[in-house]
Design a protein with these regions (language model features):
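C-terminal structural segments of small proteins and small subunits
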Residues: 48-76
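A short N-terminal helical cap/helix-turn-helix that marks the beginning
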Residues: 34-45, 75-76
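Short, well-ordered beta-strand elements within core beta-sheets of diverse protein domains
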Residues: 10-18
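Short aromatic-glycine-(Arg/Gly/Cys) micro-motifs in beta-strand/loop hairpins
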Residues: 1-10
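Short Gly/Ser/Thr- and Asp/Glu-enriched loop/turn motifs at secondary-structure junctions
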Residues: 8, 45-49
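Short amphipathic alpha-helix segments
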Residues: 24-30
Length: 76
């Protein structure tokens, strides 16, 4: 999982794109993955930047579900 940082609050990664349209297209793809994995990110978007945090809130820690979704996001 290249570029992800893990700490007590989750797996974190910032994605930077050329413009808002590219960032939005990426978020749309991640949304489909999240539905397929039945696991949804905490995220924010500001113009060309998307910040994603993955954590299993029910377990209060990073789990394999988070790592699998991070790997799927990396594969986009």
């Amino acid at each position: 999982m290249s570029g992800w940082r893990e700490d007590d609050t989750g797996l974190h990664r910032r994605f930077v794109f050329a413009d808002f349209a590219e960032a939005w297209a990426f978020m749309s793809k991640v949304a489909v993955l999240a539905e397929e994995h039945d696991h949804h990110p905490d995220w924010s978007n500001s113009w060309n930047t998307v910040d994603i945090t993955l954590i299993s809130h029910d377990k209060r820690c990073v789990t394999e579900r988070d790592r699998r979704l991070a790997a799927a996001i990396d594969a986009l």
